[in-house]
């Protein structure tokens, strides 16, 4: 065998050297081929980690969650439950089935007091960043909202999958524990997911279409089907040019008890857009300097920014007053110019919709007619109305409009997005109105809860924000809280009730409602509803809605208001002022301001109920009081207790028997 000299002085046989060279060559080829793995592309289309092997066995929607890393945050504390950690994790959703998934929604069940600071590739439905995800949160696609199938895209992962890179803060987990979510699942209608499987810092699940739930028969849609919540906003692009487009925003109130007064709408431009002109609404701030010193000012050098409506990233928008409705420049638009009033459709369908238009200018690289992106992070609020929580804009099929020519033709929007907002239940001490209870069988009134509408604006060092309110004589409900102290102390002394050294704080509500049980007899009962306005402005077209629970079907009549049952249960009744009495005036000074307390605006009526066909109704034990009460759509804080019926108080009797007793007594007096 022939040998070859090597510089090191070692002799290697030729066939061994040849084999070694071939091995190195093949290894390099294998290395290069492995570099082009079947990865998950990110936003830039680049490859990512290799998909887990479990995905190969999934015929449906595959989802995974991988915990990445964490780092201890300041301040460093010894208490493990109070220590915060910065963490990074990734989630993935892949359409591994044969059916396109429109408007995907992935729920991640966080459970370690997570605060989500940012996420790429998706948008949380539950609010804006930083987002409290202690009880989990749902992500939706942004910009990739729909997941096509591998079959129709030739396995293009940019169209069948989405990656979510999550950054946030978590609490209360020691170093030895990997903080994983409780679960991950798909929340789209018609899909079901088994329990997620976990291994170390990873978990995955394969969700499949529920065969028992048949797809609703209807028109096929190119984009996600429209959903309907309490408040529905549609963002329609009507005209599109290279550098700008005309959009129309339509707000529909679809909740029978929902309402907005003087609504304020905000959203966030994500790509440097700005509002050039508006019709049907206006922005609260118009500052040309914000435009001049922004990217818009650098690009649009010849544009007169003194005439531009708004260049804020988060503009605040409000409806125009009625006098602007026929204005040629800012009005002349259906459903506009109502001073921000959105009534329930059950009250007035013509006042349950608002509309405005805006001309939006774009910046590079979006300078073409098809580069259309809606603003994100929508929020809407009113003066004394329910709190709404809005989801992200979801692409839907273009809206249809009647042709302006009057012909039997239909005009379509270029693109449409829908934002669904739902009413949230007020948190404790965060309502905007409150309720007090009183009854004919008890001398004391149960006032509104302490700090029912919050105590952020008062000095809680001088009062107790957590104690129960003091019982009051009923006439004390007619005066402001500041004028009740002497009455409350005197009443407590008279009725031998304790008075704490530190008195309870006020309720701090602009509107309060008193519910007084007036009578209770064999076949029915009555109550008196009184609405107090402690604000300095009036409420137009006000309404009160009550849910009477078990007693609701017994509603008979209201004598000074209009009363309407709310279907389908008919346990809720909505009351509104009669014509000419639809204004709840504001608070005014007393006859002598130096001596007399302010006088609230007031509306009052008696309401009658029957006990027919309602078994086991006990008025004093709670059946005679509302289980929920709403003022202008806002759920008001209810007292924690009912007025108690003393054991010595006689039981209620029927009206007919009362009349008989009165007649006998009168006859006896005449005989004397």
Swiss-Prot record:
A GO cellular component annotation in the UniProt record: apical plasma membrane
Specify the propeptide location in this chain.
647-672
Q: Which InterPro entries match?
A: COB_C, COBRA_pln
How is loss of this gene reflected in the phenotype of the organism?
Gametophytic male sterility due to reduced pollen tube growth and compromised directional ovular guidance cues sensing in the female transmitting tract, thus leading to an abnormal pollen tubes guidance growth toward micropyles. Normal pollen development, hydration and germination. Disrupted apical pectin cap and cellulose microfibrils deposition in pollen tubes resulting in an abnormal cell wall organization.
UniProt-annotated location(s)? Cell membrane; Cytoplasm; Vesicle
> What does the record say about its membrane topology?
Lipid-anchor; GPI-anchor
Q: Which residues form the CBM2 domain?
A: 502-607
Organism of origin: Arabidopsis thaliana
Where would I look for the motif Required for processing by the PIG complex, a critical step for apical plasma membrane localization in pollen tubes in this sequence? 664-672
Key words of the record: Cell membrane, Cytoplasm, Glycoprotein, GPI-anchor, Lipoprotein, Membrane, Signal
Q: Which GO terms describe its biological process?
A: cell wall organization; cellulose microfibril organization; pollen tube growth; pollen tube guidance
Q: What is this protein called?
A: COBRA-like protein 10
Where, by tissue, is this protein expressed?
Expressed in roots, stems, leaves, flowers and siliques. Specific expression in the pollen tube.
Tree of life domain: Eukaryota
GPI-anchor amidated serine lipid modification positions? 646
Its biological purpose is as follows:
Involved in the deposition of apical pectin cap and cellulose microfibrils in pollen tubes. Not essential for pollen development, hydration or germination, but required for pollen tubes growth in the female transmitting tract of pistil and toward micropyles, via the perception of ovule guidance cues.
Q: PTM details?
A: The GPI-anchor attachment at Ser-646 requires APTG1.
């Amino acid at each position: 065998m022939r040998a070859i000299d090597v510089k090191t002085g070692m002799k290697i046989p030729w066939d061994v050297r040849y084999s070694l060279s071939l091995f190195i060559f093949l290894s390099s080829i294998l290395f290069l081929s492995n570099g082009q793995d079947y990865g998950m592309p990110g936003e830039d289309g680049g490859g990512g980690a290799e998909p887990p092997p479990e995905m190969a066995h999934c015929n449906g929607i595959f989802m995974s969650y991988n915990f990445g890393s964490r780092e201890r945050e300041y301040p460093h504390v010894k208490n493990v439950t109070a220590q915060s950690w910065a963490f990074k994790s990734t989630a993935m959703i892949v359409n591994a089935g044969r059916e396109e998934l429109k408007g995907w929604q992935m729920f991640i069940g966080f459970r370690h007091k997570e605060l989500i600071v940012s996420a790429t590739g998706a948008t949380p439905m539950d609010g804006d960043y930083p987002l409290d995800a202690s009880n989990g949160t749902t992500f939706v696609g942004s910009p990739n909202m729909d997941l096509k199938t591998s079959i129709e895209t030739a396995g293009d992962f940019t169209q069948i999958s989405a990656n979510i890179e999550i950054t946030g803060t978590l609490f209360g987990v020691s170093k030895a524990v990997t903080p994983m979510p409780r679960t991950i699942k798909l929340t789209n209608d018609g899909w079901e997911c088994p329990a997620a499987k976990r291994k170390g810092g990873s978990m995955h699940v394969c969700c499949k279409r529920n065969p028992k739930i048949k797809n609703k028969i209807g028109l096929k849609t190119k984009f996600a089907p429209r959903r309907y919540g309490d408040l529905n906003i549609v963002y329609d692009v009507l005209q599109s040019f290279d550098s700008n487009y005309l959009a129309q925003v339509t707000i529909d109130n679809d909740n029978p008890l929902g309402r907005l007064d003087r609504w304020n709408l905000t959203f966030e431009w994500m790509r440097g857009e700005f509002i050039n002109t508006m019709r049907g609404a206006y922005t609260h701030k118009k500052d040309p300097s914000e435009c001049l010193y922004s990217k818009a000012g650098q690009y649009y050098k010849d544009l007169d920014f003194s005439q531009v409506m708004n260049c804020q990233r988060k503009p605040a928008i409000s409806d125009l007053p009625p006098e602007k409705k026929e204005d040629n420049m800012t009005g002349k638009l259906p459903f506009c110019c109502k001073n921000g009033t959105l009534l329930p459709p059950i009250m007035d369908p013509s006042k349950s919709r608002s509309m405005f238009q805006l001309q939006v200018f774009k910046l590079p690289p979006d300078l073409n007619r098809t580069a259309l992106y809606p603003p994100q992070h929508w929020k809407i609020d009113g003066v004394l109305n329910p709190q709404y929580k809005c989801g992200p804009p979801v692409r839907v099929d273009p809206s249809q409009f009647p042709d302006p020519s009057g012909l039997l033709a239909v005009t379509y929007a270029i693109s449409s997005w829908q934002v669904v907002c739902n009413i949230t239940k007020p948190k404790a001490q965060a309502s905007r109105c409150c309720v007090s209870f009183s009854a004919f069988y008890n001398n004391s009134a149960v006032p509104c809860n302490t700090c029912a509408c919050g105590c952020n604006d008062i000095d809680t060092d001088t009062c107790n924000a957590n104690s129960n309110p003091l019982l009051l004589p009923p006439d004390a409900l007619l005066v402001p809280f500041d004028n009740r102290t002497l009455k409350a102390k005197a009443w407590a002394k008279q009725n031998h009730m304790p008075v704490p050294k530190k008195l309870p704080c006020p309720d701090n509500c602009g509107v309060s409602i008193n519910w007084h049980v007036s009578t209770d007899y064999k076949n029915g009962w009555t109550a008196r509803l009184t609405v107090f306005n402690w604000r300095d402005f009036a409420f137009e077209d006000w309404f009160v809605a009550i849910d009477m629970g078990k007693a609701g079907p017994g509603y008979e009549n209201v004598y000074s208001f209009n009363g309407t049952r709310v279907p389908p249960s008919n346990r809720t009744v909505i009351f509104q002022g009669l014509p000419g009495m639809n204004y709840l005036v504001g608070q005014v000074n007393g006859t002598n301001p130096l001596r007399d307390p302010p006088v609230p605006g007031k509306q009052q009526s008696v309401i009658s109920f029957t006990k027919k066909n309602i078994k086991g109704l006990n008025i004093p034990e709670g059946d005679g009081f509302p289980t929920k009460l709403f003022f202008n759509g806002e759920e008001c804080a209810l007292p924690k207790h009912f007025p108690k019926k003393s054991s010595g108080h006689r039981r209620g009797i029927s009206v007919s028997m009362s009349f008989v007793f009165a007649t006998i007594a009168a006859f006896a007096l005449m005989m004397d």
